[in-house]
């Protein structure tokens, strides 16, 4: 059996500081903005020359927060309520033999300075500090397949949770938005996805998250 070693090329800077509440797929929270910081020796402007002409990117990354748990031959996909089991290769589960993930994100801007290359991203679904091992431009002609079938995940999950704020919180958000634009929208979109475990959906647990 062959083994391979890969170098980290960058790190994600994201509003998600922990796994809880991170969208289960990219694009579900469109106001989730973040950055990919390339690290030496890959933080060269030449390495991203022409990338600004693409609207979206594939990011290949490492599931660094779950890799110690090892892989599992079957998992419980959230889309099936967290109860039915599927083979790990029929899911996007983090518990894989090789803990590699892929995320399709919006490329908003490429910023190059003397010693840094930063990609500004939108529709992000990655936790802060995620190690990145590769990036590739998204090619619509080859990768957009409208006739494809996707079993239990044919369409995006509905954002069903109603989200409201008290008057006091709304006042605080107005102040915070001066520093964090779109913060209110971001919170609404995250909570509307109901980030609780799939088997808790629809329950009134009374818990505070």
Describe the predicted segments one by one.
Residues 1-99, 112-116, 124-209:
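Mixed-charge, low-complexity intrinsically disordered regions
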Residues 13, 105-108:
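Conserved positions in beta-strands of structured domains
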């Amino acid at each position: 059996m062959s083994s391979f070693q890969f170098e980290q090329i960058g790190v994600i800077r994201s509003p998600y500081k922990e796994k809880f509440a991170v969208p289960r797929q990219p694009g579900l929270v469109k106001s989730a903005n973040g950055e990919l910081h390339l690290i030496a020796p890959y933080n060269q402007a030449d390495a991203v020359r022409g990338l600004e002409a693409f609207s979206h990117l594939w990011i290949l990354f490492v599931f660094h927060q779950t890799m110690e748990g090892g892989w599992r031959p079957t998992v419980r996909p959230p889309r099936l309520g967290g109860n039915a089991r599927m083979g790990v290769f029929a899911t996007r589960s983090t518990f894989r033999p090789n803990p590699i993930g892929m995320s399709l994100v919006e490329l908003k801007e490429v910023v190059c300075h003397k010693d840094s290359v930063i990609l500004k991203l939108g529709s992000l679904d990655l936790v802060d500090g995620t190690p990145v091992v590769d990036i590739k431009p998204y090619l619509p002609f080859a990768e957009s397949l409208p006739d494809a079938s996707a079993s239990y995940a044919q369409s995006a999950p509905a954002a069903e949770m109603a989200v409201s704020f008290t008057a006091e919180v709304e006042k605080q958000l107005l102040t915070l938005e001066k520093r964090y634009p779109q913060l209110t929208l971001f919170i609404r979109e995250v909570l509307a996805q109901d980030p609780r475990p799939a088997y808790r959906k629809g329950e009134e647990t009374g818990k505070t998250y």
